[in-house]
Amino acid sequence: MKLRILFIGNSHTYYNDMPALAAAELEKQGIRCEVTMIAHGGWFLEQHVQEPDVKFNIRYGHYDYVVLQEHAHPFGPEEKFYGAVRCLTEWIRQASARPVLYMTWAKKGEEGEQPRMSAAYREIARKTGALLAPVGELWWEYRRSHPKIEMYDGDGAHASAAGSA
């Protein structure tokens, strides 16, 4: 049996094909999986709520997990993020799947924004009971402990190949 995972987000989801990288990591652990992605550059989760294909895929895709990734640069406002997550997690649960929040990282030179982003993800995960993948926090920890590895792509926002690994 294959684990089915839907990723919903923007360029932080499709950059370096994050769903395929996640699938490869799961396969290394002996977990067979199939990933699907709905991602549009620059989109907020609020925009995905308005997209009929998103609700259709959640409802009829027979997914085990649905991973939600919010717009990161700029991040917020939190109220819109919270509203979109509440709506999406309701749809996900109605489809008998588990919601997962994929926390992103702050832009290069704006590390001070990470605590705000982290707090918002943690708060809505707690309120909705969604699983939290604290990628942004782990990303910064790795970056601090490995300063010679360039984690950012040239745009200073997206992950480089090393930052996605």
Question: Model-predicted segments: where are they?
Answer:
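Conserved SGNH/GDSL esterase-like catalytic core that processes O-acyl groups on lipids
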Residues: 2-8, 12-84, 108
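Alpha-helical cap/lid subdomain in secreted, periplasmic
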Residues: 55-161
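Conserved catalytic region of serine esterases and O-acyltransferases that act on ester linkages
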Residues: 165
